[in-house]
């Protein structure tokens, strides 16, 4: 059974309205940040506290813009890679119930490439304002702003190694995604079990690779924003937030498609299974909050 989504002018118009509304709200938010003296003082105190009270940093309105932009880039890229992880889990577990809905998480995974490019661009623009450890004076013992804690992490937290990890993780993740897409299309075209066996192998390797690299990515992209603080549970926390968000998005899109006449073969049992997924990992996320 073949279904083709009709991306008609009405849908495009509604998306345009949402985009315009988001842009207006962003402008209003920036205006409030720029012109709110009370908020300025509060954030200045927070930044001062973060800088160990030595006045290392001075708050500017664009710091809040940069930090929110970075976290959103990380969040939506995390949803994208988690959707791919969902597909891999289905092949590794040899699940049959989800075979009719895998096109949805595969489509969400398409954000991985543009999201990766956007992440590199945003990091290039915002790294000194978001990541305190990128300032060279923190490693100079003759400078009064020297930070022995951050200097002790220099072997790991340095720009070449950080960027190398970022490019490596994003590149290998996309490679796995491209391989999964290739063999899914091949399976649809040729049938049989050869492509399925390859998908099983690729997905197994990807799940193992992702289990390690996702935690390291969480340390790099989120935890290192506050270099003095650490948590042994942080990788799990970020995984849970990405994973449950991806599950919720997958479920939401499937419901919307069914309500508009698509995915008619998806029955209530499938929706019930997705609901159990979302509920279970919402509880898990709450537990490690």
Each PLM stretch: what is its role?
Residues 64, 68, 80-83, 87, ...:
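Generic signal for short, ordered secondary-structure residues
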